[in-house]
């Protein structure tokens, strides 16, 4: 192991729940406005998870007032307070980019039993 691997190991978080594409999650993000810090919740469907180790990221998509909003988060970011898994989705793909074109009921994901 080289020095970078030791730094990466020290920066990894162990409080991240297991989630995968298709799951609906709440991401509690720390937002700094001026001198104040508050928690903002971003709720949506995980459409991708990529990378590994300290560089791992995931993308969450939601509809806000009829506009699709996607946000990419590093999994081990200190700006993430915590992550809650709301529902588990039953999908057959690792990348759910096709959800970008779907609207309404067609964009619904079946829930795992």
Curated annotation (Swiss-Prot):
Record gene name: rplS
NCBIfam families reported in the protein's UniProt record: rplS_bact
Species annotation: Mycobacterium marinum (strain ATCC BAA-535 / M)
Entry's Gene Ontology cellular component terms: cytosolic large ribosomal subunit
Function: This protein is located at the 30S-50S ribosomal subunit interface and may play a role in the structure and function of the aminoacyl-tRNA binding site.
Family of the protein in this entry: Belongs to the bacterial ribosomal protein bL19 family.
Keyword list, A-Z: Ribonucleoprotein, Ribosomal protein
Protein known as: Large ribosomal subunit protein bL19
Biological process, per Gene Ontology: translation
GO molecular function, one term: structural constituent of ribosome
Pfam family, one: Ribosomal_L19
Lineage start: Bacteria, Bacillati, Actinomycetota, Actinomycetes, Mycobacteriales
């Amino acid at each position: 192991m080289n020095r970078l691997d030791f730094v990466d190991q020290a920066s990894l978080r162990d409080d991240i729940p297991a989630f995968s594409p298709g799951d609906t999650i709440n991401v509690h993000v720390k937002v700094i406005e001026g001198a104040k810090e508050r928690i903002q919740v971003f709720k949506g469907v995980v459409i991708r998870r990529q990378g590994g180790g300290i560089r791992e990221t995931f993308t969450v998509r939601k509809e806000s007032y009829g506009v699709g909003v996607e946000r990419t988060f590093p999994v081990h970011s200190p700006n993430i307070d915590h992550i809650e898994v709301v529902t588990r989705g039953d999908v057959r793909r690792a990348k759910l980019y096709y959800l970008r074109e779907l609207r309404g009921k067609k964009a619904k994901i079946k829930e795992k039993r």
